[in-house]
């Protein structure tokens, strides 16, 4: 969760936060920013130690992310070569260095499923973003003072004036600046390949999609459905 203002004390926001404790049973954290709050329940998958707990911090900026960053290890090596250091094996720890390097353009560069909130200390504002497909949920509403509140589930926002979920492939900066950084419904070109080639390419993409999801420090179990 993210609160853009300190309308609530830490004790007052706990009932909102605790409604989704089951989403992250491993650890929980509430961080006070200069103007608001960031809250995170952790389900540890990458970087299982306490060092992988969020929010992550970089020079006064903070991030909380419900997501998986695919292929993060090459990105991490590139950022290390640029002088960034990391304290955990979490894939999400690369997000603030990426934000430092690319700003809002970082979201279009990610191969990931995510719903995240960044606190930008220089602007003293929250930036919320959701992956291009909308795999990870992100809702927002307004508290009793009109401050914006972000959450993973609508029940976190009971008592707030709620808006629809943040659309897939968009980011919200501050209260009003909504930017679409990706639109998968727009087709820019069509494949001229024959049916056999198309089917082979689809098969290869499906294999690659499964393979990149197998990178985890926690034990995993495949489940088939459909």
Task: Map each language-model feature to its residues.
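Cysteine-centered catalytic environments shared across enzyme families
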Residues: 1-226
């Amino acid at each position: 969760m993210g609160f853009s203002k300190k309308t609530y004390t830490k004790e007052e926001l706990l009932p909102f936060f605790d409604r989704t404790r089951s989403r992250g049973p491993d650890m929980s954290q509430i961080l006070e920013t200069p103007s608001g709050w960031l809250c995170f329940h952790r389900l540890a998958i990458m970087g299982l130690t306490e060092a992988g707990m969020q929010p992550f911090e970089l020079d006064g900026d903070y991030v909380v992310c419900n997501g998986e960053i695919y292929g993060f290890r090459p990105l991490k090596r590139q950022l290390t070569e640029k002088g960034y250091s990391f304290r955990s094996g979490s894939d999400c720890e690369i997000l603030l260095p990426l934000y430092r390097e690319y700003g809002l353009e970082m979201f279009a560069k990610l191969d990931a499923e995510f719903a995240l909130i960044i606190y930008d200390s220089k602007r003293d504002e929250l930036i919320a973003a959701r992956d291009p497909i909308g795999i990870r949920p992100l809702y927002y509403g307004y508290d009793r003072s009109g401050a914006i509140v972000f959450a993973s589930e609508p029940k976190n926002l009971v008592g707030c004036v709620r808006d629809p979920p943040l659309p897939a492939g968009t980011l919200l900066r501050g209260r009003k600046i909504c930017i679409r950084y990706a639109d998968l419904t727009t087709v820019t070109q069509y494949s001229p390949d024959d049916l056999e080639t198309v089917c082979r390419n689809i098969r290869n993409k499906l294999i690659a999609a499964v393979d990149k999801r197998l990178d985890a420090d926690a034990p995993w179990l495949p489940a088939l459905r459909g």
